[in-house]
Design a protein with these regions (language model features):
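Short alpha-helical transmembrane segments in multi-pass integral membrane proteins
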Residues: 1-25, 80-147, 178-185, 193-244, ...
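Transmembrane helical elements of multi-pass membrane transporters/channels
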Residues: 21-40, 141, 145, 152, ...
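Helix-terminus/linker motif at the lipid-water interface of multi-pass membrane proteins
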Residues: 31-53, 122-129, 185-196, 249-282, ...
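Alpha-helical transmembrane segments of multipass membrane proteins
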Residues: 38-42, 120, 154-158, 181-188, ...
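Small-residue hotspots at the loop-to-helix junctions and early N-terminal turns
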Residues: 49-60, 136-139, 202, 267-282, ...
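Small-residue-rich hydrophobic transmembrane alpha-helices
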Residues: 52-112, 151-168, 272-336, 370-381, ...
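A late C-terminal transmembrane helix in Major Facilitator Superfamily
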Residues: 361-370, 375-401
Length: 445
């Protein structure tokens, strides 16, 4: 029997079925973009090395900017879920309204700044020359999609908060489907379309992103909640966003440093590092879907004032995530002699890939716990602690070992030791926080 909320309506128990119902659509949303990007790369790649290099530079700019704004999704989920748990759907959706205004404002600001600075920015990243010339038109067009990307992030946030992960999946898939259809037509000039080559990729991306954003906006309008700007709510969202942005920057500093140092050890080392890192990132998305379920359920339980229920959700999601990560670790341990050859047949890369591969396998069970508890604490709105824990883990664990690897020639062993230390430190921090109960703060404040 579910515990009653203040208005008498029940909070759904955190059964395995309920967690899966939230997690699987969330996984679809998380996986849709990487899958489409692979398709985009395959289409553009047939134009040759130069357009592909231009896409890489443009994609780096767009993904870096977008990843810094993930607080529009995660922060909104935490705040919206508390109101939803308290039985106040209007305020829960209202958080989405304010996040959407913030998304539009930040998005337009980013467009103006990047359009003004596009030439020096692209030239700096591409070191000038033909690559910069090729990338520039893509950047100028694709950047206009940033407001749409951020609106979709805000839409994902409030919908997760009201425990609706089905519609976001449909909207995101619809947007990427439009892009996937248009991309080859515009790149190659098929079916009477103009042959735009690399620019066609940017146009296809832009149109698909705005299709998804308009679907999210339509759903927001259908809720018939007040649409005016509420400065006090925006201020609270910006404060939480600041903490989450700093946390994201710590992640990016670590992985950029790791890639830069790996490159110093030769092509085989950096290729092996990149293969395993991309696989690690994909597995992190799989586990992150459970963390999203935790955010929604924990936030709702705390909003309803049901602390015991929030603790139950935390334990159950952590157990599921740990089991899933252990199974994944087992699969990749058993397949260690086979799976790497799926990604490359280069003997030097295969010889180097063993070190990061076994680090990845060993880290997976730790990651299962860490990512689940990340979701619990983010659902509780404990962003300041998450920021501090990530910054300390990066500055004490990951970055020193990465740069010591360069100084002492430790290679991939040192780099991946840094990542493992980073994960263990995060486990210590979030584990302590979870057991302490400091995150169990009831209400909607």
């Amino acid at each position: 029997m579910a515990e009653p909320e203040p208005d008498g309506s029940p909070v759904a128990p955190a059964t395995g079925r309920r967690i899966a119902a939230l997690a699987f659509p969330a996984l679809g949303v998380l996986a849709a973009e990487p899958i489409y990007l692979l398709f985009d790369i395959a289409v553009v790649g047939r134009l040759g090395a130069l357009p592909l290099a231009g896409l890489a530079i443009g994609g780096l700019i767009l993904s870096t900017l977008s990843s810094q704004m993930t607080f529009l999704s995660y922060g909104t989920t935490a705040r919206s879920a508390r109101f939803f748990g308290a039985g106040n759907r209007t305020s829960a959706v209202g958080e989405g309204v304010q996040a959407t205004w913030l998304a539009l404002g930040l998005g337009m600001l980013i467009v103006v700044v990047v359009e003004a600075a596009a030439v020096p920015l692209v030239s700096a990243l591409a070191a000038g020359g033909d690559i910069a010339t090729t990338a520039l038109p893509w950047v100028r067009i694709a950047i206009v999609g940033v407001p749409a990307i951020l609106v979709s992030a805000a839409g994902n946030g409030w919908m997760r908060g009201v425990q609706d992960t089905g519609r976001p999946l449909r909207y995101v898939v619809a947007g990427f489907a439009v892009s996937a259809v248009l991309c080859p037509l515009l790149v190659y000039g098929w079916l009477g379309m103009p042959r735009l080559e690399l620019v066609g990729s940017a146009v296809a991306n832009l149109l698909g992103q705005w299709v998804a954003a308009l679907l999210f906006l339509r759903s927001l309008l259908a809720e018939r909640v007040p649409l005016w700007v509420q400065p006090e709510v925006l201020r609270a969202q910006v404060v939480m966003g600041r903490d989450l942005v700093l946390r994201t920057m710590a992640f990016q500093a670590c992985f950029v440093s790791a890639g830069a140092v790996a490159a110093r050890f030769g092509a085989a080392a950096v290729a092996a590092h990149q293969v395993v890192l991309q696989l690690w990132n994909f597995l992190a998305l799989v586990l992150d879907s459970l963390a999203i379920a935790a955010q929604s359920l924990v936030g709702a339980a705390l909003g309803a004032g049901q602390l015991a229920h929030a603790k139950s959700v935390a334990w159950r999601v952590t157990i599921f995530s740990t089991l899933a990560s252990a199974v994944l670790a087992g699969v990749f341990a058993v397949g260690a002699s086979v799976f790497p050859s799926v990604f490359t047949d280069d003997r030097s890369v295969l010889d180097a890939i063993g070190v990061p591969w076994w680090f990845m396998v060993a880290q997976l069970p730790v990651a299962g716990i860490v990512f689940a508890l990340d979701g619990v604490l983010l659902g509780a709105g404990d962003a300041k602690f998450m920021r501090n824990a990530t910054l300390i883990s990066a500055l004490v664990g990951f970055l020193p070992l990465v740069w010591l690897s360069l100084a002492f020639g430790w290679g991939l062993l040192g780099i991946w030791s840094g990542l493992s230390t980073f994960m263990v430190l995060r486990l210590a921090f979030v584990g302590w926080r979870a057991f302490s109960g400091h995150w169990l703060v009831p209400g909607t404040g």
